[in-house]
């Protein structure tokens, strides 16, 4: 089955919004060193602001999802894009830890949560038939990866032309484009095609209560915590890892860009795979692959080639976990409150992200390196691979069955 023109417009708009917002967020790590030099706040304090951003991104998503589930996605996404721009553009003017936390950790990250995956995937999921949701979510997720691939090297290039303050402001302004794109995603849950909605009598509170009583939902949410730990640690501290290996900053920029590029392929592959194999099996395989990739990275000499190869391999798994995770939430608990329920899963992801970003900075200041963070990465990856195995993919409730 192919998407019709309207569905393609919705998918493309969601993918482009995610590309802009995620690209801006991922490029911010390139500015940690100049921000530290300009403010003297210290890597640990700046890492704390980035860690709070991970947490705020997660905290925002269930509430943004609840508003979108009730009133529609368009206004939520548009406001999110504006806040990302506002927080990012004002960041160079933060000269205290608390101001940095407010701008990066609250304003920009809160906006990113409002224009985040929970709201976007819900808008797309309601517009396409159930059997096509895996592919559609893979396309949207690939949009974020393309944003990372495209925006990070542009940010590095602009730094050489405009200086870091001008570059950060220019990159932040890109997120404003999410506002007009949100018009294409303005539909409300009630506008979903017949047969794709949950039973109308089920309330949001009941849907959340039922999900929190479901062991499979808890396993899935716990596994996504690990994904957040991995992604935030790498996104925030890979430039620092490169610098500690006495390699030029361009290696970090291109590594982050390649992670985004190859996650496009990973997202498409994951979206395709969940239409053919059990989603929990795809997730277990992805987490195990991450663990093996980090082990190989630790064993290899730290050269430019090593970082490039690592970026390619880890990029294939980076956000490829999103399509099967979204798919499982929708399959188990239906489409009606997907933005809210996936927002809860994303909150767990971002709690992991908070720890990955914050502990990376603390570990560096305590030991002068990141080795123990990589060891934690490996252990958590294999734990996540195992915790998905007992998940049952049978729809738990009548409303989920009706939606799936």
Regions flagged by a language model, labelled:
Residues 104-142, 328, 334:
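Cytoplasmic helix-loop-helix junction between adjacent transmembrane helices
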Residues 82-95, 289-302:
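C-terminal ends and interior cores of transmembrane alpha-helices
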Residues 99-115, 225, 306-320:
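Hydrophobic core of transmembrane alpha-helices in multi-pass small-molecule transporters
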Residues 140-190:
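Helix-loop-helix hairpin linking two adjacent transmembrane segments in secondary transporters
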Residues 28-32, 214-268:
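Extracytoplasmic gate region of multi-pass secondary transporters
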Residues 60-72, 267-279, 364-365:
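Helix-to-loop junctions at the C-terminal end of transmembrane segments
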Residues 26, 54-62, 148-149, 260-268, ...:
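Residue-level signature of mid-helix packing/kink "hotspots" within the transmembrane helices
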Residues 9-43, 61-64, 234-239:
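Extracytoplasmic
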